[in-house]
Every structure is written in C-alpha cells, then in structure tokens.
Amino acid sequence: MEMVCEKGSIATALNAKIYGNGSETLVLAHGYGEDQSAWQLLLPLLACYFKVVVFDMVFSPNVNPKLYDPERYQTDFKGYTDDLVCFLDHLHLHNTIYLGHSMAAMVGCLASIRRPHLFTHLILLSGSPRYIDDGRYYGGFERSEVNETYKNIEQNFMGWVQDFAPKAAGQNNTAAVAKFEKTLGRMKPYIALSAAKAVFSSDFRHKLPQVMVPCTIIQSKKDVIVPQSVAFYIKNNVGGNAIVKILNTEGHFPHLSAHNLLFRVLKETLQIKN
C-alpha cells in the first residue's frame, strides 16, 4: 500500500486545482462522501477574491484507491493530518485560510496544532470533535445507531446511501440530496466503511484547547449529523479566539443547499468588501 506523501507529487495524487489569483490563499477541504466538486457553487464567488486551492481527500472516488490504507486512515485522523501538512508543504503554502467541512474541520484543527504557521484562520463548517453521545456531551448519535450504520454500509451499501443522503443533506433540498448521493455512492464500499469508522469513532475533545489559530465555526440551524450545541462546545473549548455563526438553513451541507447564504457569511467573516 503506497502512502500519499511518498507517492511523489501529492498535489497530483489528490487532484489539486488552483483558481483565482488573490493575494490570500483559501484552502477548501471537503468532508466524508464528497469530492472537490462539493465546492462548485462557491468556487466562482470565492475565486474573485482569493487564490483558492481545492483537492480530493484520499477516500474520494477520484483518488487512486491503492493510496487508501485502512490501517493508516481508519484508527484516527493522523493519516489525514499528515496528508494535509504534506500537501501544503508541497505547494509551499503557509499563512492560509482553511475552510474544512465536516470531518475535514477537525483535520484542519489537528494540522494547526502541529504546524500553526500554516494557517491564519480556521473556518470550521459543520465540524464536530465527537459524534457519539458521552454523558453530558451531546454528539448527535448513540453508539447503537453508529453500529447499525456500519452494518448497513457493509450489508447493503447502495441502500444505505439512498437512505442516508436525504437525512444528511436535508429532505427539502433535492439538488443537495442528489449531489451528495451521487458522490457518496461512487465511493468503494470498503473505503466508505473504513472512513465512516474513522469519523464516527473520533474523539478530539481533548485536542481543542491546543487549537490556538483563530476559528470561525459555521453551523446550520438544523443538522441531523452535528447538533447546533456542538458548535458552541467547540467555541468554548478551543484555546484561541473563536466565534459561532448559525446559518438559517437545514442540512449538513450548506455549501450545497444554501451557498449564497454561506457566501454572505464568509464575506463577513473574511471582511470581503464589495
């Protein structure tokens, strides 16, 4: 099994693309079940103001599956963090604005702990340090639900995709549901299961106090994957400055279902004039 960072050009392996020519660099990292096309509605807007870097996470169906090592990526997010740091180094990027969606939000946090100079600002979109309830912490899922998810992915992957996509994206947005269902369904089932285990078993609550890079936490008003309370948990536990912005929309993918609303919030967050 090859390692992404030892493959030669990690930028090529992860299908990196750069848009715009702004003076500041904005890195967009997609979440589970997506690929870089998740940003297609926001890209034309953001590229007017920034040099925007997009890429595919290693679990994406667009990446050579030989690069996905379950032993490396299933146990924790270290493999993903290694990849992100290597990717930014390869492109000679530092002092970037990083927008990570869902699990990629925590990957950005972990990378910022290791190499804080790579980032000036972390934008955590629909991110969570832990998805499973734990005592007084409400993550949104009970362990039994997560175990059932693993079982469904393993036994009837496409059936699970068709059931999970509308729940995650929000029943009322057919375009967002269709987009997510398409990319999720293109994943190889064994990779989808392995990556799901990495996400749902993750617990980075103890890492949050080490995150010193300023954070903006953006969360949909209603999200069945990440409860609104998690956004405030992150704000109250990171080590650096943080603010929460709640979007008046539904679903785990506001970049698909409410991109104009999200862009307005990003303009405000990043102090874009015009």
PLM feature segments, named:
Residues 7-14, 53-99, 103, 264:
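Active-site loop/oxyanion-hole signature of alpha/beta-hydrolase fold enzymes
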Residues 12-69, 87:
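Conserved HGGG/HGGXW glycine-rich cap/lid loop of the alpha/beta-hydrolase fold
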Residues 30-32, 96, 100-102, 220:
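Conserved alpha/beta-hydrolase "nucleophile elbow" surrounding the catalytic nucleophile
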Residues 109-114, 118-155:
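Flexible "cap/lid" loop of the alpha/beta hydrolase fold
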Residues 133-141, 151-209:
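Conserved alpha/beta-hydrolase catalytic His-Asp/Glu region
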Residues 211, 217-219, 223:
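Short beta-strand/loop motif that positions the catalytic acidic residue
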Residues 228-252:
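Catalytic histidine neighborhood in serine/cysteine hydrolases
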Residues 250-263:
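Catalytic histidine-centered segment of alpha/beta-hydrolase-like enzymes
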